[in-house]
């Protein structure tokens, strides 16, 4: 799924680079799924082409609500994406209804491995009498009666009963995604914490984050100043040296690069100071404020935890202000790994746009930039090792504790 998404965005960027996005985007679904090609899990090639068409929407910063007439060509949407002054979408993620397979909401099914045994453990243990029997003695489930308790699944000695999940719903920790009356999944923004699990779980790649790639690229094409503030976890994203990765950002057209790890140093110091103050006031503990997905979880599902969340800004918050001070007339673009940061960027006036590492990889491919061949770019003020440690599990806790020293 990631490969498909990467390729599609790279193809769009390639058209943009050659000033052919509006002119040739309508041919893209046909080129990706020629008449004699084998559909990728779809029933026929025309369905596959329709899926390609609608998957371009979120990659251009649009969603399904932007389509008011199905006969409107993609070129019109491409023109809209390139001409808008600012991103105007309130939602962070969207479901491509044409790509959603409307997974059947049946959690348990008895397979033909059923031996029609005498013990009939499934029948004897079912609390709702939902087990029926065929003429050949094999069991079957009456889904109108079944409550999906799973007791039959556990009791079958032959493991002939299988659990069939709806992958996106199964992966969501807060039950923010569910089907509408047409069987298509929808994300409830009032519940969603933007963890991105549903996007990774969907086997059909029907869930997308709404990209700002072309907003960023258009500013670059206009010759405007853009500063990339890059999360330290980029060290594990590409195979070349970090200096070559930074050089690639210069090749794309960024004016300067600032490590978010610089902001992490300030977060560590300020959060340690805040922790000591809270403990002195009698508060028993304090939780981090660095993860926007966690912040959403607290605000929407664990409101009793609000008093314990740190008020210290995240590394991105401080890095953006460092960038603004150094380049007051530039647009600030946060570059990071996760969906949830899109929500934090919306809240932070100092950050203008966001790109994920995946989008950066597609931009590099689309612009034919080879990481191994670019000139290295070194940052004058590199951050200390501890600041880069924020990217590892438990890094925030470890280095905040170290900053507080033996006072806690």
Report each predicted region and the residues it spans.
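Ferredoxin-type iron-sulfur electron-transfer modules and their immediate structural context
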Residues: 1-155, 159, 165-169
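Iron-sulfur-cluster electron-transfer modules
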Residues: 144, 158-321
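Phosphate/adenylate-binding glycine loop and adjacent helical scaffold
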Residues: 338
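Single conserved hydrophobic/aromatic residue that forms the stacking wall/gate
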Residues: 399-408
